[in-house]
């Protein structure tokens, strides 16, 4: 199954959600993109995700031109929050995004996706 995660910038919540969804099942191919992609991912995000053993070092935010005409089975409109200013705030956002991604994943299973 191919899932597209959409956020505004693809610099914070989108990459986190995509990483968690990929982690939940090896049968899910996940791509995240932003409507107005940033130049880079927030460095605090990389540190917070590393604590979950997920490496986003070097991730480059993508836009619609990067995704192109790829086909997706499902689009996940990820809740997009402002990027936190401290590592502790980033951890709280990470945990929120992880929970939201898990609920989305459970919904896919419930509807036989």
State what each model feature region is.
Residues 66-70:
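Short amphipathic alpha-helix with an adjacent loop that forms part of the alpha/beta core around
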Residues 1-65:
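Conserved active-site segments centered on acidic
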Residues 72, 76-113:
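Phosphate-binding/catalytic loops
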Residues 27, 71-72:
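A general structural motif
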């Amino acid at each position: 199954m191919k899932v597209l995660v959409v956020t505004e910038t693809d610099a914070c919540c989108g990459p986190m959600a995509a990483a968690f969804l990929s982690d939940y099942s090896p049968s899910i191919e996940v791509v995240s993109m932003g409507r107005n992609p940033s130049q880079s991912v927030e460095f605090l995000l990389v540190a917070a995700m590393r604590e979950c053993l997920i490496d986003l070092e070097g991730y480059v935010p993508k836009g619609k031109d990067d995704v192109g005409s790829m086909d997706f089975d499902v689009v996940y409109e990820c809740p997009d929050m402002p990027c936190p200013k401290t590592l502790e705030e980033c951890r709280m956002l990470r945990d929120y995004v992880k929970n939201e991604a898990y609920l989305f994943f459970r919904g896919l299973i419930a509807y036989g996706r």
